[in-house]
Regions:
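Residue-level detector of solvent-exposed, low-hydrophobicity positions
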Residues: 9, 28-30, 59-63, 73-75
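Beta-strand-rich recognition/accessory modules
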Residues: 1-43, 84-153
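Surface-exposed, gly/pro-biased binding rims or lids
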Residues: 70-91
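Surface-exposed beta-strand/loop patches in extracellular or lumenal glycoproteins
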Residues: 46-56
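Short aromatic-acidic-glycine turn motif
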Residues: 54-68
Length: 153
């Protein structure tokens, strides 16, 4: 559980002091980039995982795809796992651009569709609402920076 710390209008700071290994989290917005910085306590030698649920307009349609090292390993509606990743592009035709995920240290990325269920006149429907991105890595001593950058075509 994160507690909010005094912040400025340019960033928000949080801390998790109620755990064995405190984590500090700083969120800032700079032009077209969202930065999230994690700072770990020195004694934390664990695996750190965080989850990003990102609504992409194309969702599981034909216009949404991952681009990794210049290749397309799959679409937003597919399961994806990549190791030693520091950058991946989420390219979306409906968005008319892309979201670039960058990390300061190599991570394991697990991506999968996030579905909801709704009831309509024809019964229950499973609808993809977002892309879930799980970022996992050993806690780096210098901390971890995750950046999401939105780019128009």
């Amino acid at each position: 559980v994160y507690q909010h710390e005094p912040s400025t209008d340019k960033n928000n700071r949080f801390r998790s002091d109620h755990t064995l290994f405190p984590i500090r989290k700083n969120i800032s917005l700079e032009q077209n980039r969202l930065h999230v910085d994690y700072h770990f306590s020195d004694q934390m030698k664990q695996i750190f995982t965080t989850e990003i649920n990102l609504a992409m307009p194309s969702c599981d349609g034909m216009g949404g795809r991952y681009v990794y090292q210049g290749k397309i390993p799959g679409g937003f509606g597919q399961l994806l796992e990549l190791n030693h990743l520091t950058e991946i592009i989420l390219d979306d035709d409906t968005l008319g651009g892309s979201v670039v995920l960058r990390t300061s240290s190599p991570v394991t990325l697990r991506a999968y569709p996030h579905y909801s269920v709704s009831q309509s006149e024809s019964g229950f429907e499973k609808i993809m609402q977002a892309v879930t991105l799980q970022v996992e890595c050993p806690t780096p001593a210098q901390g971890l920076n995750i950046t999401l950058e939105i780019n128009a075509r």
